[in-house]
């Protein structure tokens, strides 16, 4: 449970997968350099199962967790989509309903 230092927020978490660590690092570096994300967490070793063009696929991927704000999310999604090697990359935006005030302040200050 968050204490009195938690607050409502306009922050969001963006989920994206990449085919390998090098691609994930490149994508993360792009959105960080453009100040569209405050932080990127890269989790290698994810296994994704999905149907693509009628066939069950299984891929080993890197799960990316990117932290940003509502006002930066569209630019981040466009940046990721334009540089991503997948035809249809995973781009999901999850609202952050509450968070630590100090962390959220840092997140906002880290963006352009």
From Swiss-Prot:
* PANTHER family linked to this entry: DIVALENT CATION TOLERANCE CUTA-RELATED, FI09726P
The protein in question is named Divalent-cation tolerance protein CutA
Described by its record, this protein's role is as follows: Involved in resistance toward heavy metals.
- Extract the Gene3D superfamilies matched here: 3.30.70.120
Annotated Cu cation binding sites: 16, 83-84
Which cofactors are reported in the record for this sequence?
A: Cu cation
The entry's localization annotation reads:
Cytoplasm
On whether S-adenosyl-L-methionine is a keyword of this UniProt record, the answer is: no
Assembly behavior: Homotrimer.
HAMAP family annotated for this entry?
CutA (MF_01160)
Its GO biological process terms?
response to metal ion
State any single GO MF term: copper ion binding
Q: Which family does it belong to?
A: Belongs to the CutA family.
SUPFAM superfamilies named in the record:
GlnB-like (SSF54913)
Instruction: Spell out the InterPro entries in the cross-references.
Output: CutA_Enterobact, Ion_tolerance_CutA, N-reg_PII-like_a/b, N-reg_PII/ATP_PRibTrfase_C
Cellular component per GO, a single term:
cytoplasm
